[in-house]
A protein has these predicted regions:
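PP2C/PPM-type serine/threonine phosphatase catalytic domain
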Residues: 1-325
């Protein structure tokens, strides 16, 4: 188990991982706060934050190498440049993921023997919203995703903003709202998007889900259909050009809102936790809480590695003078 906690005047940062029933943790997580300017000539810098979560593919070899490679490339891309929002279009993140993909593919071919290696990737980058050249008090969140690791936005009771492009919306039993921003790159989600799944009652009374897509047709019992969510149609490290497959979503975080990244080992059973949104937004030791949830999920039968990271927005933002060299 690996955990992290950091709190500043701007953000609370947490993450937690658990091996599950595996001997190797193929998940990798990165989280950090840094500084950003609105333009190259700006004399002030503002707080920003990033978290990255990668789930190395358990069905492929060396998933831990693949996930850590993506983390390293995204981290180095952000740390290696003092980002200004005037020029930022997300390409720096996409390029880093594509470069990591190239490294993983090259590594897989070393020694003349092809070895399959891959990973999911979800990145959340938070930076100040600029209105008429000044910080508005809200944060823009840019999310980049490929695979089935998820990004959720958690809304405080005072938050008025709702994402227009959320994949799904919900509330926990306390009334706290959350939005899932990312679409899973899974076969199940693909069939759902294509409206290819219908519920059918067979003559013997058995209930099945019929998948009909082009020339393919098959009936699945509920447990079989659920397994399709683990069949990925896109990830890092399997094909040469992945940049066009990377989802990019933009939303807004207000003070006291939060963001959660989760591997499938963590989100599989998240809906069974009735107060998770409130507990993450309002809890003091969220990394400890995430660890408790992971142990509960394992006791309920989860076998995969489990990982989650959280960024909570605090109410103030520290502005610093910038020295341009």
């Amino acid at each position: 188990m690996n955990s992290y906690f950091h709190s500043s005047s701007n953000f609370d940062l947490f993450y937690q991982t658990n091996l599950g029933s595996h001997s190797v943790n193929e998940d990798s997580v990165y989280i950090s706060e840094f500084k950003i300017t609105f333009s190259e000539d700006d004399t002030k810098s503002y707080p920003a934050a990033i978290t990255v979560l990668c789930d190395g593919m358990g069905g492929l070899s060396q998933g831990d190498f693949a996930s850590q490679t993506v983390i390293n490339h995204v981290r180095d891309a952000v740390q290696g440049s003092f980002i200004d929002l005037e020029d930022f279009d997300g390409q720096i993140i996409k390029n880093a993921i594509q470069q990591a993909n190239d490294v993983i593919l090259a590594h897989s071919s070393q020694g003349g023997e092809k070895v399959s290696s891959g990973t999911t990737c979800v990145v959340a980058l938070l930076f100040p919203e600029c209105v008429d050249g000044d910080f508005s008090g809200r944060y823009v969140v840019k999310v980049f995703s490929i695979g089935d690791s998820r990004c959720y936005i958690l809304r405080s009771a005072d938050s008025s903003y709702r994402s227009e492009s959320a994949a799904s919306l919900g509330r926990d039993v306390t009334g706290m709202a959350y939005e899932r921003l990312t679409q899973d790159d899974s076969l199940l989600e693909f069939y759902r998007q294509q409206k290819a799944i219908t519920k059918v009652k067979l003559p013997d009374g058995k209930l099945v889900f019929r998948v009909s897509y082009k020339d393919f047709r098959r009936d699945y019992v509920p447990a079989e259909l659920l397994r399709l969510r683990s069949s990925l149609i896109a990830c890092v490290g399997v094909e040469s050009l992945i940049e066009p497959r990377i989802q990019e979503i933009t939303s807004i975080l207000e003070p006291h809102d939060g963001i959660l990244l989760a591997s499938d080992g963590f989100w599989h059973r998240l809906d069974h936790v009735t107060t998770w949104c409130r507990d993450i937004l309002e809890g003091d030791e969220v990394h400890v809480y995430l660890g408790e949830l992971m142990r509960d999920f394992i006791s309920y039968g989860e076998r995969d590695n489990l990982s989650a990271s959280v960024i909570r927005v605090r109410s103030s933002a520290a502005v610093q003078e910038v020295s341009h060299v």
